[in-house]
Amino acid sequence: NVSRGLAQRLRALNRFIDDIYNRQKILAEDVVPAELVLTSPNFRAECVGMKPAQSAWANICGTDLVRDSAGHFFVLEDNLRVPSGVSYMIENREVTKRVLPELFYDHSILPVDDYPSRLFEMLASLAPRERKRPNIVVLTPGIYNSAYFEHAYLAREMGVELVEGGDLIVSEDNYVQMNTVDGPVRVDVIYRRINEEYLDPEVFEKDSLLSLIHISSPRDKHR
């Protein structure tokens, strides 16, 4: 029930975001005050009219759950921007299985070690062109980021490249490419671990050195 409820919640959040940046019906009907949304520093006017793949604005959500003394679950918050921490969960499970294996003998505990493969499948489903194995990259701010271990861990476990902004370029025909020793290679999907305000200095934070100029152009052209 918890799993189904969280999936339903994420679908609702995605539909809310899609409505905010497109029809804005929820604002017109005053379900949510328009002023509250449109004046929010987190509202991105650049995203108005966008249609992401499969209408999924948030493909990954880190929902914090708490349970009260009566055993009822409550959502503390939904981390939709750049959720972090899953690698520590996986590593913690591995350590627990080795140190306290008896905990797993008599309890039905769902596995978590398949997360990287499921993450890869989800990212691959978003590729704009059909390929047997889409070219996916994990975009990291770099080694000084507090979650860099996770960025490297997930890239390694998925078998994809870990890149920084300087490793990517936008071609003249508006495709994102990755610099390699053999020349530029087209990128199909970017799993970004960078807040959106640092993505493109021409569109968002002008002093950002973490990503690359024009990365928003392929997005605008649905590439």
Please give the residue ranges for each predicted region.
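Single conserved hydrophobic/aromatic residue that forms the stacking wall/gate
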Residues: I213-H214, P218-R223
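ATP-dependent carboxylate activation and anion-phosphoryl transfer catalytic cores
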Residues: N1-S211
